[in-house]
Amino acid sequence: MIMDTSLKNNDGALEADNKNYQDYKAEPDKTSDVLDVTKYNSVVDCCHKNYSTFTSEWYINERKYNDVPEGPKKAVVHRCTIL
């Protein structure tokens, strides 16, 4: 089954992203995986999504956060959606 994983229609992933990013900002010495947010759910659907952004973004595969300078930038971000 193909799932829509765009940011505008994937509130679960976006919410997890935001919480994970805030957790990182609060504890810059410890980066957590988005799966930490959803690990208590029995099933999660993960995929890679390409998108352009003008804001800060995080690269979960490298387990680090990068502040992206203003301007369009392509990124591949690991996203998980609670089913």
Swiss-Prot record:
Interacts with host IL1B. This is Protein L83L. One of its GO terms (cellular component) is host cell cytoplasm. Keywords: Early protein, Host cytoplasm, Host-virus interaction. May subvert the host innate immune response by interacting with host IL1B and interfering with its function. Belongs to the asfivirus L83L family. Induction: Expressed in the early phase of the viral replicative cycle. Its main location: host cell. It is found in: Host cytoplasm. The lineage of its organism: Viruses, Varidnaviria, Bamfordvirae, Nucleocytoviricota, Pokkesviricetes.
